[in-house]
Amino acid sequence: MASKPAVSVSISNLYPGCENVSVRSRSMMFEPSLTKGVLEVFSPVTTALSSVDDLATRAIEIQNSNINGVGDFSVWEFSGNTVYHCCYDYFVANDPTAIHLILFSLEEPYEMQLSQATYWLNTLKALTPPQHNIAFGGRLQNPLKVVLVGTHADVASLIRGPGGEFCYAKEKPLLKELRNRFGLDLQLSERLFVMDTGASNSKDIKLLRSHLLELRNTILSTCNPMSGLMERLVATLPSWRKLTGPNQLMSWQQFLCDVQEHINPLVSEDHLRGVAQQLHSMGEINLMQSETVQDVVLLDPRWLCSGVLARLLSMDTPKAIHHYRGRYRVEEIQALAPESDVEELLQVLDAMDICARDLTNPGMVDVPALIKTNGLHRSWTEEEEDHDVLVYGGVRLVPAEHLTPFPCGLFHKLQVNLCRWSHQHHTGDDAVDEPPDGDIRLWTNGVKVSQGGAEAMILLVNHGQGVEIQVRGHESERAKCYTLLDTMVTISESLLSSTLPGLLPARYYLSPQQLQEQHGPIMVYQPKDFLRAQTQGESSLSNTMGGYRESFSSILAFGCAEVYNHSRQGRDIHISQVSLLARRKLCRLLDPPDALGKDWCLLAMNLGLTQLVAKHSSNLSTTPTNESPATNTDPSPSTSPTAELLKDWSVRPDSTVGVLMGKLRELGRRDAADFLLKTSPVFRVQVEGVVGGGRAGLGGIRPHL
């Protein structure tokens, strides 16, 4: 049994009921709305599934509480066990009326403190969807509010200042580093709050409470006051929860009808949606939306978070053999939630990408978060006699901006999506407790699928910092190999954009020859390698690890001329293919006025868009240049001139990545050109020109909540 870290007395005094939460590294979120709010606590500490702690938080525990001197809150406490993280994206950052606290222990080395804070800040940033209308400087109109808290100051033997508060020597470099990385994406508080773990009435605690109260009051000042309808709904919800039955789920239309029938027959749907959003912010209900489960109202979040998810994903679940593969019988799911309608429950869990129903065997359900089988299939088998006639290729998806792991739980969701894809595209007569033979195999941090003579392995690599997709097949099936790789990459990138809409991924390519030789480490080619080679008129790249060159065709298309000849590469790809997040970053770089004129204005003239200069120049004198969200409170920021420039320029057929990159270098903006070089797409296929290629079979991908 794992030992339990010491609990901070001061943090326990901040709100009651948190005595079973480690404060080594975690994040809390206060969501004040009207008279209440939500406090969320979660930790990045990875706990082995075999480690059981009777006092540990299971899934998400919710309680109402009062923070002394601040106000009433609904406290959401998230388990640090990563098995539960596959559901956190629906609750962690789904409301703008929030204050997030990221806590880390000052006992840890500085590098660990920076790593832990970066992980959580990157998670919050990744969960924030981008705005389609990009504001000046790429600013967000309502960035999440974040407070950094260093704990165990007394244990770390920090000295006190003249006012009695702790002084941390590395506070300024830590805040500077984090602000440089996230200051334009999140509203970071101006200081690091350093906590004394043994003094609940210390000045440090009082400063933190005062800051929380200030933030809370600011948020409440922008919220609508509690209406009579809301007061009646808050009073009525407890009785509705009792009448709803075993599942605390209700369709939006039924919720609307009940409100009109029992509370106010004149209430409109639009007005009720606003009230429901406020109830959502208060933690009274939770609104869940999906194209498969339309507008579901979760009447009691505790039922799902503290009940169903805690039992389903618990490490105490019986350890039958098939459970090590993450597969359950529907009857076992029913036993974990005996009072629930299991079919209705599975629809919601399926829409949340927590489980996947096996269409070839409807009595079985895949729950990848519970897989305990280790990497038995992390490399290709070597039993094929025709090994030399196989072709290989691969892609690695990584976060483009910050070298940090993907948020925990992402790969479990990817496994769910791949299970769903496999179930929808294949049939089999396998045994009840076995996955379809040859179609899909799952293990911890890995998946293996096959289709049409090609097979793929999808792996979580580099300590969670990359998702790697390797594909191989017979050399006579090169187009099918490309199709399978394209399908797997598309599923992965679609999941990233829906689950982590604020995370910008980059696509790297793996050396096909080294994959065939099965020798590591594998050479990884980045977008900049292809674009630089194109600029020099080359169509191959140097593998410095292997001592040879590899052609674009072999790296990008398995050497298939049918695919490669109907594609565009790097510099020739149209600017409209550059992602919204990449455009937003360019706006941050080019919008602020430059002393030498090397900004959007001169770029517009170089691109022949002089009409935009007069249109937007009048806004420059009143628009902040490069302020962080913490200091810039303009409620209606002006439109980004760089975004308008790219929008107008993209209507031209000759507006390519290569042209823009050249203009940026002529302008002397190497920073913007290098960023474009780093994140631009490398390869685009005109699907209609490829027989059997392109994105075949993608019709089975399910939308996400």
Where are the regions a protein language model picked out?
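Charged, amphipathic alpha-helical linker/scaffold segments
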Residues: R583-D634
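Extended, non-catalytic interaction/assembly segments in eukaryotic proteins
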Residues: M1-D72, S79-Y90, I99-D594, C601-L602, ...
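Alpha-helical bundle protein-protein interaction modules that mediate dimerization/oligomerization
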Residues: N606, N619-H704
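Alpha-helical structural elements of signaling/regulatory helical domains
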Residues: V267, A595-L596, R652-S655
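A general alpha-helix detector
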Residues: Q254, D258, K585, D599, ...
